[in-house]
Amino acid sequence: MLRLRNPENNPAGIQMRLGFEGFMQYRSEEHKDWTIHDIVLHKEDTDGNRRMLDAFFKEHPQAVLGAVFNSRVYQVANYLHEKGQKLAGLVGYDLLHKNTEFLKTGEVTFLIGQRPGLQGYCGVKTLCNHVVFKRPVTAVKYMPIDILMKENIDFYFEFE
């Protein structure tokens, strides 16, 4: 399995790390036989990313699954599309237009929608409760996610 992640100093790193830890817990309970390989892609270095992916797939031609723990699953899907390759499963985050297009073509298997509007609303509400109403704030607020696939992506946007 290929795992793509941000450099550690990225501001989204904490949320991504927590998502990865949950994924690894699931893997340890359900799929102990999976081998995980890390690759760090850089947002602005398309050529470097291509070289890293070339080297990875040359060294690990048996890789069949991929998980991208940030919003750039489209980079991997585009790379695979250009190479005429496809993974048995490729999962990513966020409903960027590029990501949803690759989801619709089947080159991305699942996208995890994190409901950013709801997250923003809850953040402002919590801030208001704390600052204006002097109410205590919880350190962690669990939020719902949506698991989307090509069969339900069009319906999802109808109800936003």
Regions picked out by a protein language model, each given a short descriptive name:
Residues 41-99:
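Hydrophobic alpha-helical
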Residues 115-160:
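Hinge/cleft segment of the Venus flytrap/periplasmic-binding protein
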Residues 2-24, 28-51, 68-72, 94-96, ...:
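Hinge/beta->alpha junction and helix N-cap segments in small-molecule ligand-binding domains
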Residues 97-108:
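Glycine-rich, charge-decorated loop segments at or immediately adjacent to ligand/cofactor-binding or catalytic sites
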Residues 20-25, 75-80, 128:
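Short, well-ordered amphipathic alpha-helices
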Residues 88-89, 110-116:
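Short, glycine/charged-rich beta-strand-loop motifs at protein surfaces that mediate ligand recognition
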Residues 2-3, 23, 103, 127, ...:
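Hydrophobic structural packing positions in well-ordered secondary structure
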Residues 31-33, 85, 105-106:
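Short, well-ordered coil/turn elements that cap or connect secondary structure elements
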